Amino acid sequence: MKLITILLLCSRLLPSLAQEEGAQEMDCNDETVFQAVDTALKKYNAELESGNQFLLYRVTEGTKKDGAETLYSFKYQIKEGNCSVQSGLTWQDCDFKDAEEAATGECTTTLGKKENKFSVATQICNITPGKGPKKTEEDLCVGCFQPIPMDSSDLKPVLKHAVEHFNNNTKHTHLFALTEVKSAHSQVVAGMNYKIIYSIVQTNCSKEDFPFLREDCVPLPYGDHGECRGHTYVDIHNTIAGFSQSCDLYPGDDLFSLLPKKCFGCPKNIPVDSPELKEALGHSIAQLNAQHNHLFYFKIDTVKKATSQVVAGTKYVIEFIARETNCSKQTNTELTADCETKHLGQSLNCNANVYMRPWENKVVPTVRCQALDMMISRPPGFSPFRLVQVQETKEGTTRLLNSCEYKGRLSKAGAGPAPDHQAEASTVTP
């Protein structure tokens, strides 16, 4: 049986989405409704790894908003069909599965339209499983890809590697963070194959200021978005030995509203000579001298970079160079202004995090340092401290939101590791 537009049985128009300024309700007899929902449903079926395709049952809500790009929003209901996702058929060529055994669902989607072509911007489908017969061991395909929980601990190192690979191999100015795991499958081979689909979002951490993703990097709600499909092979030594992925990245300048000029709650660069840093630096050097077992005190020689972030208080992140002084801990109870740095003393490159809540008199400093061995062989008269430059960032940049569209193709299950690309080996540590 071929499903045609008669399936577009509208139970109600859009009372909620129509409240959006400029949004117009759509009539169920509008052919555009079918074309848009057909695009969205085909995309959803194309992303399924196993099982049967879903068929359109009813469109329940629909609006459009005109602009530089016309935006369409729909809610529609779907039911499981009798055609597998590998059949090569479209959903219109399938029949509904028996009602009692069929899974059902409801999808919410937003699409854009340019040059008479629809593209899915966002889509969320909630599926209710049917009451089909339970699978036995004989029904399971040994050696085939099987779905696994998307919050499985086995996926943590795989996802971490995937996001790091994306950040290290793209020319984007900012780091991206994981937002959602959309699909996860594993296959037992001589080791383990993983297939994952996940979404990413731009954070406020630029690659210029942050060499790697940190916990305080904040996802930007109006930043660039992307969706990735990855294949990972973990060998019998629990090492990621094979990895490939493809990502579709979409700029945040096509849909929805402007990003505020100021990102409240995001880390901001502050001048290295700012008086605001005085107290935080004092706590940092005190913590360094308290935890360092060197016979002499250290003092801060150069502040290289500093940021502050408003949280429940203020968090300072400071990079500085500390140098050994002539004040020994045996004869001095604390570091004083009279302590001078030794010309050939030891130097440390330090990173400090200082969390301050003044109204509670609470200060929590953490400092990590590494010796600057390069200082031993510096030429006479040369001081790397004089070469430190303050980097300024431009404010006022605005970005627009555009949710991602995934255009990936199904991958065939294989018995070995994904052959596309070999990533650098990295040990899997949950």
Curated annotation (Swiss-Prot):
Region (Disordered): 410-430
Post-translational modification Pyrrolidone carboxylic acid, affected residues: 19
Subcellular location field: Secreted, Extracellular space
A Gene Ontology cellular-component term: extracellular region
SMART domains recorded: CY
Listed Pfam families: Cystatin (PF00031)
UniProt name for this protein: T-kininogen 2
